[in-house]
Amino acid sequence: MTARAEYLDHEDFLYRSHKLQELSELGVVLYPYEFPGVFSCEDIKKTFASQELGNSEAAMSRSTPRVRFAGRLVLFRAMGKNAFGQILDHNQTIQVMFNREFTSVHGLSEDAEITPIKFIEKKLDLGDILGIDGYLFFTHSGELTVLVETVTLLCKSLLSLPDKHAGLSDKEVRYRKRWLDLISSREVSDTFVKRSYIIKLIRNYMDAHGFLEVETPILQNIYGGAEAKPFTTTMEALHSEMFLRISLEIALKKILVGGAPRIYELGKVFRNEGIDRTHNPEFTMIEAYAAYMDYKEVMVFVENLVEHLVRAVNHDNTSLVYSYWKHGPQEVDFKAPWIRMTMKESIATYAGIDVDVHSDQKLKEILKKKTTFPETAFATASRGMLIAALFDELVSDNLIAPHHITDHPVETTPLCKTLRSGDTAFVERFESFCLGKELCNAYSELNDPIRQRELLEQQHTKKELLPDSECHPIDEEFLEALCQGMPPAGGFGIGVDRLVMILTNAASIRDVLYFPVMRRFDAEKTN
């Protein structure tokens, strides 16, 4: 049996629910179907804030502009024959004035034993959604205000709002009940407006540069394209195991084979792994592939894209301050070109280790001495994996300004071409870092089907020998598509949520997701 939700026994819920019957008896329509022809608060302010509107007497004579808008009542105070309120519409508020002689309540019976102003004072509550028809004026202090001619109750709020001054301090409540967070904090609302704007900017930039947006399956028979554990489910219609995608890469490359020269997808990806300040199991990525480009051209494209986004949200400045870096606020300049270093150069620069002069055994000793890795973690590691581990443990946190770290060990990915110089120990891959976190991953894509099969089979064999590792299946359809012929191409993937964190100055990835992954709600516990 499902436990009874505790809010159903809250005093404010019971008190406000009782008012519903009273409102109905007074002739007020509960939960009307529409309130057409509304302005937004933002539009009203933009249109009229700089105009000469006159005072409340001019509004009383109906000689000022008439407006219709709707929103949530978030502040109310009675003052003699007038009462003032604040109406919240998304992330903007407008002051309203209710007048004893001027304001009426839509639907209130003419023979009701309560005046409109008393109805407003006694029957409305903070949190109610109201429709407002009225006339604009400026108060003596210069505040744009609407003298309410008619107020319409559009939705009765049965639960009280968070305290206006204290707000929501409990992060658990903020993330689980995001609607309260949005109502009580304009800053939170602005963050999500900016997130939507950033995603729109990304799409517009990609479209303007000739990329075609495509959609590929979220549910897949075979997962791949990244080193990650998938979420699994069962498709009843086919009696088969399915996976939520861990990457967009494989499906996009199949489309590239089909002839689309520039493609991208911006969508959800799922990885059944850890949760922390910069990781959520469900997250948004953009992956893009451009025929006839290589990783150097992709590098230029990525830094120009990010610079464009920074300028767009930062008043055309390329430099912004991120307040939540681990050592305190940090100013970062995203103006292209960004710093470029090979992985080996970055280890020499930031860790003081020239890997070329050390044996594998010496690199293992350095890792043992300078990191918290258990010795067993790299006892049988190849040289390339040792180099990658040195970078991850000793370098990445130091990359504060935007960096492209290029030429990674071949062991780090089976999907990338080796260096054209002939050094087969390293691949044409770069990762972009900022504030110690990875922003982008990019390759000169491997399009040799024979070599691709060899690498995937080698990876599969190694994974089978490791009992705790995720053994990815080999996607034969992908290999068949490569045999059809895929043009040389450059590709990249960017974690959109992590980028939005920086651009909105958010402390955690949870602050830029409407509903981040949380533990399952237990109705038996206190809300």
Swiss-Prot record:
InterPro entries: Aa-tRNA-synt_II (IPR004364), aa-tRNA-synth_II (IPR006195), aa-tRNA-synth_II/BPL/LPL (IPR045864), Lys-tRNA-ligase_II (IPR002313), Lys-tRNA-ligase_II_N (IPR044136), Lys-tRNA-synth_II_C (IPR018149), NA-bd_OB-fold (IPR012340), NA-bd_OB_tRNA (IPR004365). Keywords: Aminoacyl-tRNA synthetase, ATP-binding, Cytoplasm, Ligase, Magnesium, Metal-binding, Nucleotide-binding, Protein biosynthesis. Coiled coil: none annotated. One of its GO terms (cellular component) is cytosol. It catalyses: tRNA(Lys) + L-lysine + ATP = L-lysyl-tRNA(Lys) + AMP + diphosphate. Binds 3 Mg(2+) ions per subunit. Mg(2+) 1 binds at E431, E438. This is Lysine--tRNA ligase.
